[in-house]
Amino acid sequence: MTSAPRPCEFERTCSALASPELIRLITEIDDNGTIPPRGLARTLPDLSPHQLRHAAAQAHTLGLVRTRRGLSLTESGTQLAEVYDEAARWARAHDYPGVTNTFVTRVRATLQLLGSADVSVRRQERNGELGLVVSLEAIESLTGPKNAVESWIARHGGADPTATEAFEGARQAA
């Protein structure tokens, strides 16, 4: 049995996995299968070339995709898609971050909430970045998404700190 990830590793991984472009890429491949070679822009036309490059590079660095005959998910990528589904189910059940949101917004907000150090405190919380109040009941039920992320980290090693820092630096520069 593996131990739970260290808090900083958990927070870093939640932050890396909460990239909207990465969420879109992983769920697109999970839902619709391999993206053909040079088909990424056609598949996700609302993302800029920079966003597409960033998502593909991050997915490669984290070992989520392989490029054999197009872009497809590795075992790690498939299991991450399940983590995203779990996060979205929790968000939908608790109307988080709001009643009408997209899948990406729900997953991102849930991962940001999980990655915040305040969530471990058993009281009503305000998510600083989004300014949302989360009920005690909702926080207590975060065990499903939290366990899913912890399990993914245990199997696949989480997010490499140097890769995460490089991607955050590139994102801020853009």
Where are these regions (language model features)?
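Short amphipathic alpha-helical interaction segments
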Residues: 46-61
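Recognition helices and adjacent regulatory flanks at domain boundaries
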Residues: 1-6, 56, 68
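Amphipathic alpha-helical dimerization/coiled-coil segments
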Residues: 85-173
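Short alpha-helical segments that sit at the start of domains
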Residues: 2-26
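Short acidic, hydrophobic short linear motifs in intrinsically disordered regions
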Residues: 32-44
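Basic, amphipathic "hinge/linker" alpha-helix immediately C-terminal to the N-terminal HTH DNA-binding motif
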Residues: 67-90
